[in-house]
Amino acid sequence: MTYNIHVGVGMDKKLDLPRIAKVINDQKPDLVGLQEVDRGVERTQHIDEIAELAKLTKMDYAFAFNLPYQGGQYGVAILSRFRILATDHRHYKNLREAERRGFIRAEVLAHGQKLNFVTTHLDYQYEDGRVFETEQLLKALENVAGPLIVVGDFNDVPTGGAYRLMRGSFADAWSMSNPNSEGLSYPADKPTKRIDYIFTRSADGLRARRGWIPETPASDHVPVVAELEIRF
């Protein structure tokens, strides 16, 4: 599952983390990549959002901050039904003065086997920035062993350069399971864009059995969920 939670603020402009947690719990995911997560930030009442969501979902978690903001941290996070064994966080270099972004990778123990799960959030303004970030992401992951899943808000449509780069070595779980559906995820009240993705490394042989997009106004994005079959 991938979900840009908009720091817990829904389309009604209300901060409501229990609502976000309910959306997650209703899908019963094993792994969740979250983007736009606050930790101790003034605008979200200094709440440690990922710790709170972990408590409400009863999942393990990992957080990586991309920016210091209003006395706290803002970044990406992972929730896992499986035990997290190790994490890795990288910041991307920028082509120009822009918001610092990055990714977090968690190695988890799934049914006795190691699995790597990554979430990222790319530049929303410039396509060349997204492409540059994606190049760095792929380079950082090229030697990761075992099944690899990459999810996130790529801020890129399927005709964009970042998406095309990912498809060079990764399969698109939504396209595999829903070839006749657009998979629109933003904005939440009336989605017109597909920018949130679940990718599986092609060489690993992961198969998307099904994918779905819950309708919810809990954030400005809707989540994207896939059921994956992994042959260890």
Segments predicted by a language model, with ranges:
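N-terminal, active-site-proximal structural segment of metallo-dependent hydrolase catalytic domains
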Residues: 1-56, 68-73, 135, 230-232
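Active-site-proximal beta-strand elements of phosphoester/diester hydrolases
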Residues: 1-9, 88, 105, 114-122
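Active-site metal-binding loops of divalent metal-dependent hydrolases
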Residues: 3-5, 37, 120-122, 153-154, ...
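Active-site environment of divalent metal-dependent phosphoester hydrolases
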Residues: 8-10, 39-45, 69-71, 125-128, ...
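Structured beta-strand-rich core segments of catalytic domains in phosphoester-bond hydrolases
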Residues: 12-13, 37-114, 205, 212-213
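Loop/turn elements at helix/coil->beta-strand transitions in domains of secreted/extracellular proteins
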Residues: 28-30, 58-60, 113-115, 145-148, ...
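Active-site neighborhood of phospho(di)ester-bond hydrolases with catalytic His/Asp-centered motifs
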Residues: 33-35, 62-65, 149-153, 172-175
